[in-house]
Amino acid sequence: MTATIVRPLRGRMEVRGLRGPRGDEPSNRSMFKTATGKAIRPTWVDAPEGAPRWQGYWVIAREHLTDVAEAIAIRDGQVEIEMHYSATEQCDRRCRSAEGDECTCSCEGKYHGNNHHASWIDVGETTLVRSAGSKTVTRTLTRHQAQEDRDARLEEWIRQLRE
């Protein structure tokens, strides 16, 4: 079973289907804390009464999406990430010039932080609009891609320290 991270439009993320540690691996809580390097407060939500324990899940602050997803993919081989996007399909100029990975608009993160205009139409000072329905997108992050992404961020961080 592949673990799934569900990132709703608002609120904390759910990490479902995450296997327990094997051998000398740290607990899942410790893995989250190590991955984020921050004060993270993962909360375990028990499975409904009578259901198997594996139907329980972790709840984590959404700002830890990248770090937690990479840690799970590196340990388990891959993780699926279910991301929910706004039903109003509005993409904001602030999205295109943003830093970080928090995007809930209808661009599905494609234009987040890269100032890409695509087929968006300017409406007012900051809002861009395109018509369509609501979206849920599931992406898979593999161990190889997670390690490459983590290494690239580390190299960029080191480069910035040297400047």
Predicted features and spans:
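Accessory DNA-engaging acidic/polar modules
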Residues: 1-163
